[in-house]
Structures are given as structure tokens and as C-alpha cells.
Regions:
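P-loop/Walker A NTP-binding module and the surrounding RecA-like catalytic core of P-loop NTPases
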Residues: 1-114
């Protein structure tokens, strides 16, 4: 069940910190951008168990505008580090906040009449 899985995740996190404490450690939570506010709820559950250092936000190539990016930062204080814009491994990109904001407010130009 969910509680057992979360306990296992916490155990893995503790063991890694104990065994290789001197190594840099990054724990990224992968969230689906199309789930909206539910992504925040999911992240809160993971934050109770593991030391999450950032987020990978997938499915930003679809209809989702990714407004959850702002909520992730504001409500949880987590940076979005990577985004997925397709289905392949080469479709992951570093998250660039400036480009993201530009894309949110981008409008398609109306066709010019001849």
C-alpha cells in the first residue's frame, strides 16, 4: 500500500545519506504537469518522507500550460529543474524560467489579410 511504499522510500533516503554522506545528493520528484493542483498534493506527500531537492515536470508539450510550476515554487519552495516536452529521453530540457514565462504569455499572431 501507499504507506508501506513511502516508508521504503524514507528508508532508502536514510541509507544513502548514511552510507555516502559526503557525496552530493539530489532527489528529484517527477510530476505530471497535466494533473494541476493534484501535483502539489503528491509533492507534499513525498516531502514528508524524502528530502526532495527539485522537480522534473513532464507533459509540458500538451495542453497543460504548466501553471503548476508557480505553485510548486510558491507553496513548496522547490525549484523545477527539468521539463519533459515529449515522450523520448531526448525530450528532457533544463528548465529555463524566462523562456517558460515568455511561453505562458505568447500569443499567436492573427493572419494578415491581403
Amino acid at each position: 500500500n501507499k504507506a508501506n511504499l513511502m516508508n521504503e522510500l524514507g528508508k532508502i533516503d536514510r541509507i544513502i545519506k548514511r552510507e555516502i554522506s559526503e557525496a552530493p545528493q539530489e532527489t528529484l520528484l517527477v510530476l505530471d504537469a497535466t494533473t494541476g493542483q493534484n501535483a502539489i498534493t503528491q509533492a507534499k506527500v513525498f516531502l514528508e518522507t524524502a528530502h526532495v531537492t527539485g522537480v522534473v515536470l513532464t507533459k509540458l508539450d500538451g495542453t497543460a500550460k504548466g501553471g503548476v510550476v508557480i505553485a510548486i515554487k510558491e507553496e513548496l519552495g522547490l525549484p523545477v529543474k527539468w521539463i519533459g516536452i515529449g515522450e523520448g529521453q531526448m525530450d528532457f530540457r533544463p528548465f529555463e524560467p524566462e523562456k517558460f514565462v515568455d511561453a505562458l504569455f505568447e500569443t499567436k499572431a492573427a493572419p494578415q489579410e491581403a
